[in-house]
Amino acid sequence: MNSALPEDVKNLLTELETFLLDVLKAETLSKKGKEKKEILIKRLKDIKHSYPQEFQDKAEDDDQEENDGFPLPPDAVSLASDRDKDEDLPYDGSFYPPVAAQDLEYLKAGYLEKRRKDHSFFASEWQKRWCVFTNSLFYYYGSDKDKQQKGAFSLDGYRAKMNDTLRKDAKKDCCFEIFAPDKRVYQFAASSPKEAEEWINAIMNSRGIIATEDEELYDDVNQEIDASLEEDIYEELPEESEKPVTETETQKATPVPVNNTSGKENTDYANFYRGLWDCTGDHPDELSFKHGDTIYIISKEYNTYGWWVGEMKGTIGLVPKAYIIEMYDI
């Protein structure tokens, strides 16, 4: 009679099996590596055959954990049993009947990497999913040919925004999340930052939401300024490089009255700032200045991230807005 396996040993064997069958499936192995993989899989099968009751109980426990806490309708049992172990029911316990991916009338669909809510040491944290959203629901499938979804949730109350803290690899700037107060956050990675922005736009537009400054599409100001923008800035520099400095000196002597409403002059004065503290740029595209220096603000395009584009003494660069203050009280 076989003795019982310790729980931690069973868990380790289960994770090892997941690693061999799922994680290594997408890897290119050498001939020797493939042979070793097959040997380990065979040994795992032999162990499971030697302890059938142990692993049968484990499978039943997993199914029970998947359904705990949510009352499922009788016809939902088969659907729940077919879900991946990493997939879960909607936060609010709602049940969405199975629907084939190709039967949906959608606003946007495509392959994304979905971050698993829970993942083991060996199992991949991100899984490729065919994602589809309609006017009110977001579905995700194993592929675009699947007859039923892996999961679904209502978009009611949800918003979408970029999140560059989810990964540290090449897809760091391709990640976004769908979130709502007191609800589960769903996190995804697209194939490119542009595709992620398209998903965010589509989701926000479908909800009739206008993005606030905090939810505007991500544009990393630490990266180099877009080539076309940079060219536009420096093309104007020869004509205007000395002008802001001259105007600044004049304004120091004769500040504009608060009630001045003279169109362009008023606008120009409003764009003059002075340094609150010394600031040394960490990157070539950042402007360095000292306390009291006069800076002319050209653009507030990166306001969301706390940066503006400024010009000082013929040099143009990014300026942290927290380090400057308006020169005149307009």
Swiss-Prot record:
Biased composition range(s): Basic and acidic residues: 240-250
Record PROSITE patterns: PH_DOMAIN, SH3
Region Disordered: start-end pairs: 57-84, 236-261
Phosphoprotein found in the keyword field: yes
GO cellular component terms, A-Z: cytoplasm; plasma membrane
CDD domains on file: SH3_SKAP2 (cd12045)
Start-end of Polar residues biased regions: 251-261
Compartments, record wording: Cytoplasm
Keywords: B-cell activation, Cytoplasm, Phosphoprotein, SH3 domain
Regions of compositional bias (Acidic residues) in chain numbering: 59-68
An individual GO BP term: B cell activation
Stated family: Belongs to the SKAP family.
PANTHER family assigned to the protein according to its UniProt record, in alphabetical order: SRC KINASE-ASSOCIATED PHOSPHOPROTEIN 2, SRC-ASSOCIATED ADAPTOR PROTEIN
Protein name, as recorded: Src kinase-associated phosphoprotein 2-B
Species the sequence originates in: Xenopus laevis
Gene label: skap2-b
